[in-house]
């Protein structure tokens, strides 16, 4: 019923919001002779603020059409490499008319970025993707808003997430692949690769795990504490709701995006209020650069998706309440998850010093679990001054984190290239 009430509220506020947008555009239009009259700039700024606070935020586009690779500008086309009901595997295909750049790009490592299914869309990793395109062939998991998936497609739980990751790795080809998991998916990615290793399947050349809850018992944050302070029944009764009839997924049980968004705001309400006030002041001053930066940030931040109820509850129970992975007690579709089975994949873990979502040590715990990976094939980094988002987006990601990720991938990519050469020619490369 709460979801339906939210939809009614949205339908009532929608016309007011778009009326405010029209007023803001009219009052601030360059050709409007009254635009600079006393009080008019305040009216225009106030109307735009009302519009942005009340509008419906659609899923943003990645919008990566041009990028830089090997110091050259290249064209990028976004393609769907594999489609599943709850996720699209997307590839960002690079193109160049420079022969030298083409040759370099052919030899670039292949990277799969596994994005979180945790409220925001995969486009939150736009900066991650754009930066990786400099030196890599890039794929990403683009999770589908659960309210858009017909109930006839069935449920989707944590085990299904693991199975999806396995399928994507096989589709791309594990032997030449490097997997980067950001935040929440570090857990299912580690499970997927562990299961593949235990079965004797090829595993990715390297695993880079960034800011994820491998062992939430270490340095628990407010997010971790929330999951342990309430029983699973509380989450079932308070945050799980049914998709209303006006969506393709009508009747599906979900953790609604609007509730998740309320939770995001509640974590730092003062910061968001201050940001909106600053936006209003920027509009009054005519500071369009800062105002546009605010628009872009909140266009992404306010665009949320519904999570499948089963997946959300599985994550709460198995990851944050029972700690099944670090305790060695997690079974996926009847198979025990044993990270000790991973031997060939290199492992890099990255944590932000100031991360208030995944505390220090939680991601590093992967090294204790992956006991069969030799020490020379493992590395751990703590990024000074970085919060949760800083390890995969923004200046600190581009200037500090990315070079370390790139170098680690390059270090362990060469054996795959040598093996590929042997398969093509039948000859081993000459020793250096």
Regions found by a protein language model. Give the residues of each.
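Active-site nucleophile elbow and catalytic-triad environment of alpha/beta-hydrolase enzymes
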Residues: 320-339
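Catalytic histidine-centered segment of alpha/beta-hydrolase-like enzymes
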Residues: 383-399
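Short, surface-exposed "cap/lid" segments of acyl-processing enzymes
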Residues: 63-149
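Conserved alpha/beta-hydrolase "nucleophile elbow" surrounding the catalytic nucleophile
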Residues: 180-186, 352
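Conserved acidic catalytic loop of the alpha/beta-hydrolase fold
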Residues: 148-150, 160-177, 189-194
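Alpha/beta-hydrolase-fold enzymes
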Residues: 1-45, 174, 192-310
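Conserved alpha/beta-hydrolase "acid-adjacent" motif
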Residues: 356-362
